[in-house]
């Protein structure tokens, strides 16, 4: 039963990647949309990593990391720090590094940096825009707290 579900998930992920690669990413109307679609693609590779093993895990994790890294670098250049897509990307990328790749220090540093940067500019940010994204900011902060406690225990 487990294998059947995993096969079905892989087929769904392939379909999603196909739609993203064929239609959404190449036809994105702006850079923010392109980053969002790339993030989704990386997210689905991350989901695949949750049950993949061996070579399949290596391929899925390599693809996820490559795409997360590419869109994270692009987002840093063109999206404001408080942008919902950029914050969601930072959250998901850091979770990938922490949970999937077991790069706890890198994940902690990434989350801490973005949280620290957003706290520095929060007063300057248009209040409405910032409040729309407070949940993402709070999730990043919660991960920092959890990861900090886990690191202290090690």
Segments predicted by a language model, with ranges:
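Short coil/linker segments at helix-helix boundaries
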Residues: 1-11, 15-26, 46-70
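Amphipathic alpha-helical repeat scaffolds of TPR domains
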Residues: 3, 10, 14-17, 32-53, ...
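Flexible helix-coil transition and linker loops at the boundaries of alpha-helical arrays
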Residues: 12-34, 74-82, 121-128
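Extended, leucine-rich alpha-helical cores of fungal transcription factors
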Residues: 31-36, 58, 62
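Acidic, serine/threonine/proline-rich low-complexity intrinsically disordered regions
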Residues: 51-64, 99-110, 153-154
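A contiguous pocket-lining binding segment that forms or flanks enzyme active sites
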Residues: 56-81, 85-99
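TPR/TPR-like (Sel1-like) alpha-helical repeat modules
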Residues: 105-122
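C-terminal accessory extensions/subdomains outside the catalytic/core fold
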Residues: 122-126, 145-152
């Amino acid at each position: 039963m487990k294998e059947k579900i995993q096969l079905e998930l892989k087929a769904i992920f392939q379909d999603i990647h196909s739609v993203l690669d064929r239609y959404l990413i190449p036809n994105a109307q702006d850079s923010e949309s392109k980053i969002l679609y790339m993030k989704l693609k990386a997210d689905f590779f991350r989901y695949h990593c949750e049950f993949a093993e061996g070579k399949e895990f290596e391929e899925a994790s390599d693809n996820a990391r490559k795409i997360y890294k590419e869109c994270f670098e692009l987002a840093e250049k063109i999206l404001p720090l408080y942008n919902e897509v950029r914050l969601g990307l930072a959250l998901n990328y850091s979770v990938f590094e922490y949970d999937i790749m077991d790069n706890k220090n890198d994940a902690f540093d990434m989350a801490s940096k973005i949280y620290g940067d957003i706290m520095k500019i929060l007063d300057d940010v248009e209040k409405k825009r910032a409040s729309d994204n407070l949940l993402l900011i709070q999730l990043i902060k919660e991960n920092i707290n959890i990861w900090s406690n886990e690191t202290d225990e090690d």
